[in-house]
Amino acid sequence: MRKYELLYIIRPSVDEEAKKALIERFNNVITENGGTVEKTTDMGKRRFAYEINKMREGHYVLLNIVAEPKAILETERLMKISDDVVRQMTTKDER
């Protein structure tokens, strides 16, 4: 198993309950595929450096994950399908 950092941005128009449900949903996808979420950090609403899809800000969420690559691929696939996720990026944690 490898360590990963997954950062994703949720649309600013999503209310607090829906945001929590979305975070929980993606955490469950990782655990259902044999991974573990070590830490979930809600970084709050932040302004973008440039406009993305006519939006100027979004809710940033950072996940520290230990998982197999298949769990990461499935999570990324679901994030790309979701209209509530503006952007996502996964990096291998080398620490």
UniProtKB/Swiss-Prot annotation:
GO BP annotation list: translation
Gene Ontology MF annotations: small ribosomal subunit rRNA binding; structural constituent of ribosome
GO CC aspect terms: cytoplasm; ribonucleoprotein complex; ribosome
Keyword list, A-Z: Ribonucleoprotein, Ribosomal protein, RNA-binding, rRNA-binding
Taxonomic superkingdom: Bacteria
Gene3D superfamilies: 3.30.70.60
Similarity comment text for this entry: Belongs to the bacterial ribosomal protein bS6 family.
Cross-referenced NCBIfam families: S6 (TIGR00166)
PANTHER family referenced in this protein's UniProt entry, alphabetically: MITOCHONDRIAL 28S RIBOSOMAL PROTEIN S6 (PTHR21011), SMALL RIBOSOMAL SUBUNIT PROTEIN BS6M (PTHR21011:SF1)
Primary role: Binds together with bS18 to 16S ribosomal RNA.
Name under which the protein is recorded: Small ribosomal subunit protein bS6
